Amino acid sequence: EMATLDCGTCNFGGDEIFINTDNTIANFGDIMQERGIKPECEVFDKGMIDLALKAAKKGHIQYPIHFDFVLGVQMTATVRDLVIMATSIPADSTWTATGIGKNAWGIAAATIAMGGHVRVGFEDNVYMSKGVLAKSNGEMVERVVQMAKLLNREVATPAEAREILGLA
């Protein structure tokens, strides 16, 4: 029902570059629409937001758009960076944020405080704290639930999450 659509080229460091042209984004967006799949527009910097919006204006991505801001790879992972990303998307968009590695928990807390949603898991981080490996994805989810409660945010049920994401 939902799949990642990387909305631009990403330099992962060293010689590793993931190339995603405007045409590639458009083609994948069209295929997703044909198959009834909602894109999670994964963006690693502000320019990728602009490319996603460009594809949406041309009809390759349907509104409302769901974004996942991935911070700590191509762009630094500061609260300022998160604010720039969150204020650069249409008001009817939904968004999650992910801090890679050591950035995971600070970005999670800032995201919750800003009204966004959090993505956690072994794809992005394996540590609960410096040198302490997470036992499971569930342990990471539980930490985010605790953060949300401390910040007076309600945690969505699976049905509510589907509705928020436009999958209901």
Regions found by a protein language model. Name each.
Residues 2-123, 134-139:
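Catalytic alpha/beta core domains of metabolic enzymes, predominantly
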Residues 17, 129-153:
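C-terminal helical cap(s) of enzyme catalytic domains, especially alpha/beta-barrels
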Residues 49-50, 128-129, 165-166:
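Short secondary-structure boundary/hinge segments and terminal tails
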Residues 146-168:
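Mid-to-C-terminal alpha-helical segments outside catalytic/metal-binding sites
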